[in-house]
């Protein structure tokens, strides 16, 4: 029995999950291109996104998230570092949690049509699925502090 690829549009939640799946291996494999990482993430659950004329299509928002996080990684890591407790460093964090934090902070800082609370809640949902309960609470705490700082500067 042949497995068929569904040809459907992704929700923003699903796009965030695909972005996480693309960004995570990019941290470990210097030879992996952004486009290859996105392609692998889209192929992970046998989904194929196609345009009306049948062309394979990468959702614009997925490209924005992956490209944005990649290009601003140092800046995003600085924001994370500035919001860690005294006894914490980036080296102590689980790699998946770092990627989740980068993704959410990128949305908070650079995606104007996503409310900060939505970025925070989506990150918590991703951490529930890909990390553990302690990480979920940690991600929520860090992002709550980032959100408060952003909101106070607005």
Swiss-Prot record:
InterPro entries named among the record's database cross-references: NusB-like_sf (IPR035926), NusB_fam (IPR011605), NusB_RsmB_TIM44 (IPR006027)
Keywords per UniProt: RNA-binding, Transcription, Transcription antitermination, Transcription regulation
GO cellular-component term (any): cytosol
Pfam families to which the protein is assigned, alphabetical: NusB (PF01029)
Signal peptide range: none
SUPFAM superfamilies linked to this entry: NusB-like (SSF48013)
GO MF, any single term: RNA binding
One record GO biological process: transcription antitermination
Family, per entry: Belongs to the NusB family.
Summary of the function given for this chain in its UniProt record: Involved in transcription antitermination. Required for transcription of ribosomal RNA (rRNA) genes. Binds specifically to the boxA antiterminator sequence of the ribosomal RNA (rrn) operons.
Name of the protein in its database record: Transcription antitermination protein NusB
Taxonomic source organism: Enterococcus faecalis (strain ATCC 700802 / V583)
